[in-house]
Regions:
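Short, non-helical or kinked segments that cap or interrupt transmembrane helices
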Residues: 1-5, 46-59, 134, 158, ...
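Helix-loop-helix "hairpin" substructures at the membrane interface of multi-pass membrane proteins
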Residues: 104-181, 204-205, 209
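Cytosolic-side transmembrane-helix boundaries in multi-pass membrane proteins
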Residues: 140-154, 224-274
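Transmembrane alpha-helical segments in multi-pass inner-membrane proteins
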Residues: 177, 181-245
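Short loop segments and helix-boundary regions at transmembrane helix junctions
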Residues: 39-93, 128, 188, 194-207
Length: 274
């Protein structure tokens, strides 16, 4: 949903503005859209105490269908095209640093730095703030949190909305450097994000490493033709594109048993049961 709203916004306004200003504005728009869309999930799972897996799956099926329907209704085709004016050839000063400049500050997108910033802020908030402590408590033992005066429903609503905001931003960040022709799909990478969370064992530092690992897998799937050794191998193109998904299955097979999710994750809270 975030990818659709963001790319559609860029498609409409790219003739009036361009570059980083348009991209940053699009990110704000998708953050709001993602937060609003997540309210449907929050209401179903918190107020109605619906099964969160079913609610999430329903919304996940609805989002691409809504994107395709809306795109075809407005412009007659499923694909939404946009002009990539967001690529940064070199960050001033930082791009001139030997080795590091070539790796991190040349041929890049501002979304990379936004993603790193979001990770750092999220890691700090979860570990070092009152809200983070309450959020973890409502995921581990909501009854105990409720007994000391924490509004479990309010905190869980906040958690779901924040997740929606980040998911919306993530959808746009995925599409921008990948293609200039969005076809209402993010190729299942939202589910790979869940795999990153499980592989990272719900810990910030491990999630960072897991994200880096899956980033390498995605790079191999997308840019294998630029690597002479991989290009020379008699392997079909389709197999390279399967690398992130195959890696996900292998990683989850070996790590899912050791990954401890919050004990109350996915369980509706009934105040009368504590």
């Amino acid at each position: 949903m975030g990818a659709f709203v963001g790319i559609f916004f860029i498609n409409i306004f790219q003739d009036r503005m361009s570059g980083q200003k348009l991209l940053l504005l699009a990110i704000l728009i998708v953050a709001v859209a993602g937060g609003l869309f997540s309210l449907l999930h929050a209401f179903a799972s918190i107020n109605m105490k619906a099964d969160q897996t079913i609610s999430g799956t329903a919304l996940n099926l609805f989002a691409p269908a809504f994107a395709i329907f809306t795109a075809r209704m407005i412009q007659g085709v499923q694909q939404i095209q946009f002009t990539d004016t967001f690529h940064i050839d070199k960050v001033p000063v930082l791009g001139d640093i030997p080795v590091i400049g070539d790796m991190f500050f040349q041929n890049c997108y501002i979304t990379t730095y936004i993603g790193i910033g979001i990770f750092l802020v999220a890691a700090y908030v979860i570990k070092n703030t009152r809200f983070g402590l309450r959020l973890r408590a409502c995921g581990e033992h909501p009854g105990a949190a409720d007994s000391v005066g924490v509004n479990v429903a309010k905190i869980r609503y906040a958690g779901v909305i924040i997740s929606g905001v980040l998911a919306g931003i993530g959808g746009l960040i995925f599409v921008i450097p990948t293609s200039t022709n969005f076809n209402a799909s993010v190729a299942g990478y939202g589910f790979l994000a869940i795999a990153v969370l499980i592989f990272g064992q719900w810990r910030s530092n491990k999630i960072l490493m897991a994200g880096f690992f899956f980033g390498i897998m995605k790079t191999l799937a997308s840019a294998y033709s630029a690597i002479p050794f991989l290009k020379s191998l008699p392997i079909p193109n389709e197999l390279y594109k399967m690398i992130p998904y195959i890696a996900t299955l292998i990683v989850l097979a070996f790590s899912s048993k050791n990954s401890q999710a919050p004990r109350a994750e996915g369980i509706p809270y009934d105040k009368g049961s504590r």
